């Protein structure tokens, strides 16, 4: 659109009959012949599939076993050809073809055992959960240039005379997460509520010896509006006082294999007269990568009055995040590169929310 709006309108709207190439305004910066740009072939094909299923079995009264599984697939085909008879094509080595393929597979499954019963004024709900998930990613791309004809476009890469180091690449990554969780909830007479949770997660992204994290939490609540002495206050529909404390973990900022020392090819050299690929250290490894943990305390009041026409919620919230994941600047030497992802720093936050 920019080239169409900014291109010199006095230039001819056909190819130069002597050269067979679209005329370009050589004085313009990043403004190309818009008619020539129409000859660029650019095609993207994306596929997305999501399948999930759930099975529930009642073992005995109040005790249920539930299994859930999901699979998500995503792929992208990116195909592009810049012909040799436009300025962009001549700038990219007399025509350029590019192919890229990316594929992602996500698999998740869990088993959940839930028990819920009421005994007079007592109500209990207990849950045990086992969950596993994996994600794999594959990418490849190839780029060639030097095309004497535009007939093949991107359908015949070997028709391009030139391919430079790094123009053909591929990579694959995979990570897994395994979780165990248990929760117990107890309510007495619809007035007093106690909830306790324990969770243990293991991530393949983290350093050896630091892959597992333990994350407990607990909360209590008093539903004061259900007390006998509150019944005379008919304009109050709900009055609940609650407090909770818990620990959560984060490892999303970490890429697969970031705790390891990775090698990557960086060229070729002659060994005994034969071309041999050379490798180098690709990044700073950090075998001490571990879970970032957030410790949270919350106390609050929920109030609803006049048939819930008026609602009020007030909270005091405080949290401390420890072992924060951040990319820090490091000295060279002893490190190979100037930056590294590490667990450092602490952040505290407190607020009152109404």
What are these regions (language model features)?
Residues 22-82, 92-352:
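Extracellular/periplasmic, surface-exposed regions of secreted and cell-surface proteins
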Residues 1-34:
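Acidic, glycine-rich flexible loop segments
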């Amino acid at each position: 659109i920019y080239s169409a709006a900014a291109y010199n309108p006095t230039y001819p709207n056909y190819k130069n009959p002597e050269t067979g190439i679209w005329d370009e305004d050589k004085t313009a910066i990043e403004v190309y012949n818009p008619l020539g740009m129409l000859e660029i072939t650019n095609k993207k094909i994306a596929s997305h599939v999501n399948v999930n299923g759930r099975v529930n079995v009642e073992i005995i009264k109040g005790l249920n076993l539930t299994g859930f599984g999901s699979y998500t697939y995503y792929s992208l085909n990116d195909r592009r050809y810049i012909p040799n008879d436009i300025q962009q094509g001549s700038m990219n080595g007399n025509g350029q073809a590019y192919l890229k393929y990316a594929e992602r597979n996500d698999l998740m499954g869990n088993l959940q055992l839930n028990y819920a019963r009421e005994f007079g004024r007592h109500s209990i709900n207990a849950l045990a959960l086992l969950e596993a998930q994996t994600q794999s990613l594959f990418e490849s791309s190839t780029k060639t240039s030097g095309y004497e004809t535009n007939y093949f476009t991107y359908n015949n890469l070997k028709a391009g005379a030139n391919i430079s180091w790094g123009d053909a690449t591929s990579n694959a990554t995979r990570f897994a997460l395994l979780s165990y969780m248990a929760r117990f909830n107890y309510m007495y007479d619809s007035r007093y509520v106690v909830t306790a949770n324990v969770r243990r997660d293991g991530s393949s992204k983290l350093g050896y010896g630091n892959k597992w994290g333990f994350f407990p939490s607990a909360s209590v609540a008093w539903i004061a509006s259900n007390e006998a002495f509150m019944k005379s206050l008919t304009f109050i529909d709900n009055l609940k006082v609650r407090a909770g404390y818990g620990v959560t973990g984060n490892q999303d900022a970490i890429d697969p294999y970031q705790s390891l020392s990775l090698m990557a090819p960086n060229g070729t050299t002659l060994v005994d007269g034969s071309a041999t690929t050379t490798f180098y250290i690709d990044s700073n490894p950090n075998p001490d990568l571990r879970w970032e943990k957030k410790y949270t305390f919350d106390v609050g009041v929920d109030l609803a009055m006049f048939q819930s026409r008026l609602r009020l919620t007030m909270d005091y919230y405080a949290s401390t995040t420890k072992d924060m994941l951040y990319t820090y600047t490091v000295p060279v030497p002893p490190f190979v590169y100037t930056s590294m992802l590490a667990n450092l720093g602490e952040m505290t936050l407190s607020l009152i929310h109404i």
